[in-house]
């Protein structure tokens, strides 16, 4: 009977350690986000024909360590050539910026009146993220010139 107990303890310890190891190996934390897009002096669209306005971006579920990309099209809707700048605001929770970064591939080129460029927006989630299960923030695209 004593041998059976020792065997059960060893089996229980083995199973428990496998659960811990599996938990360490599998990042099953998914983050959900929706970001609002505000445009100043420009239009931001889902298509190059500028018929589908972007008002928000649903990043969907993202695992730790993931990079999510979306392509948008930005049109100069002002009356002079412009360059673009980007800001993010209203991060919720406020510490999300410790683990989540946002960037784009715009290279600073001048955009003439009514011209359209494609831009990739990227969301990067740190593999060390903790304590955040949902987040949101606003993206502000500014055309100036």
Predicted segments, located by residue:
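Short, polar/proline-rich extracytoplasmic segments that appear immediately after membrane translocation
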Residues: 2-57, 61-62, 142-145
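Short, well-ordered turn and helix-capping elements at secondary-structure junctions
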Residues: 58-63, 106-108, 125-127
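Solvent-exposed, conformationally flexible loop/turn segments
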Residues: 60-67, 112-116
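Surface-exposed binding patches on compact interaction domains or structured appendages
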Residues: 38-54, 79-116
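Asparagine-centered strand-capping/turn motif at beta-strand->loop junctions
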Residues: 74-78
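C-terminal, structured domain-capping segment
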Residues: 72, 115-145
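Residue-level marker for the onset of beta-strands and adjacent loop->beta junctions
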Residues: 68-70, 107
């Amino acid at each position: 009977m004593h041998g059976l107990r020792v065997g059960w303890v060893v089996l229980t310890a083995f199973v428990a350690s496998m659960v811990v190891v599996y938990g360490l190996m599998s990042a099953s934390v998914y983050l959900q986000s929706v970001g609002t897009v505000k445009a100043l002096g420009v239009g931001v669209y889902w298509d190059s024909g500028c018929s589908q306005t972007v008002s928000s971006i649903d990043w969907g579920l993202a695992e730790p360590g993931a990079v999510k990309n979306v392509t948008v099209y930005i049109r100069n809707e002002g009356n002079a050539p412009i360059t673009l700048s980007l800001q993010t605001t209203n991060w919720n929770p406020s510490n999300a910026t410790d683990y989540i970064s946002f960037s784009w591939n715009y290279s600073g080129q001048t955009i003439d009146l009514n011209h359209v460029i494609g831009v990739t927006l990227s969301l990067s989630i740190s593999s060390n993220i903790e304590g955040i299960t949902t987040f949101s923030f606003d993206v502000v695209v500014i055309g100036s010139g």
